[in-house]
Amino acid sequence: MQKASHKNKKERGVSNKVKTSVHNLSKTQQTKLTVGSLGLGLIIIQHGPYLQITHLIRKGAAANDGKLQPGDVLISVGHANVLGYTLREFLQLLQHITIGTVLQIKVYRDFINIPEEWQEIYDLIPEAKFPVTSTPKKIELAKDESFTSSDDNENVDLDKRLQYYRYPWSTVHHPARRPISISRDWHGYKKKNHTISVGKDINCDVMIHRDDKKEVRAPSPYWIMVKQDNESSSSSTSSTSDAFWLEDCAQVEEGKAQLVSKVG
């Protein structure tokens, strides 16, 4: 009986040690954040199967709250358990949340370390910086500095002056130029206008071979008659020669008739 009680005490001690170790590994932190114009104010990366906070955006909801820290791993956002979520799935979840919504955020603290490449790049993250609006006084001071610097550098060579010349700030907004489509520029059909010269000269593209002494004669009715007879006859060479002979005879007869009419 004493041995059995001693074993039970040992098992209880081991179980208590396991519980405390598990509790240390799963140390959690919980807070409530109000969604603002900057969202939750968190910069999150996907570290393996987890979503880990790397930086807090200045003046964001998380930075103003002060309870979340870089390195925390997200457990749940609102009613959604985000363990195993990808960044794409997490973004789809946040798209349905409007500004002013209060979300309960639950994270693991001291669970995994931030990757080394993400620890010292705060200055390279554009979301962590905010644009500083320049006043007209600052613009005037910048212009004065540019003119004084150009006066001090009068002894500098002309090439260096052109190379390192500081142009004054310009407040005029220039519209962005629409980029040219590569497919249209490379594969587009380009129309080319080609002119073709037609004439009697040898240098023309199309040369007309024509004798001005001979008049252009209209087709004779005799040719039609002989052509119809030619379809029924077997010899084509004799019919064509007869046709030209009949046509010439007809023109000779017409010439004689005109001479007789003039004489009379």
From Swiss-Prot:
Q: Which PROSITE patterns match?
A: PDZ (PS50106)
Q: Which domain of life is it from?
A: Eukaryota
Q: Which SUPFAM superfamilies match?
A: PDZ domain-like (SSF50156)
Query: For the PDZ domain, which residue ranges apply?
Result: 30-109
The protein's name in its UniProt record? PDZ domain-containing protein 9
